[in-house]
UniProtKB/Swiss-Prot annotation:
Entry keyword set: Cytokine, Disulfide bond, Glycoprotein, Growth factor, Secreted, Signal
A GO term, aspect molecular function: interleukin-12 receptor binding
Record organism: Cercocebus atys (Sooty mangabey)
SUPFAM superfamilies xrefs: 4-helical cytokines
Major subcellular location class: secreted
Membrane-spanning segments: none
Gene transcribed to yield this protein: IL12A
Record's protein name: Interleukin-12 subunit alpha
NAD listed as a keyword: no
Length: 219
């Protein structure tokens, strides 16, 4: 494993561990400010887990378990959710604190107040960009799966719906990601393997998003 990937993995594990601890120590009742996005993130995680479980059952003769697949992060070099959502308590570079405390105005419904810190806005925007990338990938893959004469598996509207709901709650304007199209005849076996890889990666990202929302709600 290359040093950069190892460093990112360590940072991700530290963030998840810290956010998990913060959530366990916090009051269970969600605060009114972050409740909308916390609710949406919980739905997102539930949909991600259910969709992955269903895919593993349907594709039981395919390499679709966590141990069998080649893990891939499609958001790599495109977003920086782990870094942007790192709690201030874990930041060692004090020169960054002033910019992190700067207030900005947001348009999303995640916060009761549209005024939030620069770093919280950056964190939420990065989550939005993650969701947008996965949304495009899922739609592209679903279009291929629907072409399969066997109609063995395809994504239902639930997972696409919860992604869209959280994106609407975050409400960031950004460039449209074009949906990929190919003139080649789709390889349905490879597409189903790719679906497994994508669902495993999305579940991990959904866990991160849910823990970030829980932490923000508690703080």
């Amino acid at each position: 494993m290359c040093p950069a990937r190892s460093l990112l993995l360590v940072a991700t594990l530290v963030l998840l561990d810290y956010l998990s601890l913060a959530r366990n120590l916090s009051v269970a009742t969600p605060g009114p400010e972050m409740f909308p996005c916390l609710h949406h993130s919980q739905n997102l995680l539930k949909a991600a887990c259910n969709t992955l479980q269903k895919a593993r059952q349907i594709l039981e003769f395919y390499p679709c378990t966590s141990e069998e697949i080649d893990h891939e992060d499609i958001t790599k070099d495109k977003t920086s959710t782990v870094e942007a959502c790192l709690p201030l308590e874990l930041i060692k570079n004090e020169s960054c604190l002033n910019s992190r405390e700067t207030s900005v105005i947001t348009n999303g419904s995640c916060l009761a107040s549209r005024k939030t810190s620069f770093m919280m806005a950056l964190c939420l925007r990065s989550i939005y960009e993650d969701l947008k990338i996965y949304q495009v990938e899922f739609k592209t893959m679903n279009a291929k799966l629907l072409m399969d004469p066997k109609r063995q598996i395809f994504l239902d509207q639930n997972i696409l719906g919860v992604i869209d709901e959280l994106m609407q709650a975050l409400n960031f304007n950004s460039e449209t990601v074009p949906q990929k199209s190919s003139l080649e005849e789709p390889d349905f076996y490879k597409t189903k393997i790719k679906l497994c890889i994508l669902l495993h990666a999305f579940k991990i990202r959904a866990v991160t998003i849910d823990r970030v929302m829980s932490y923000l709600n508690a703080s």
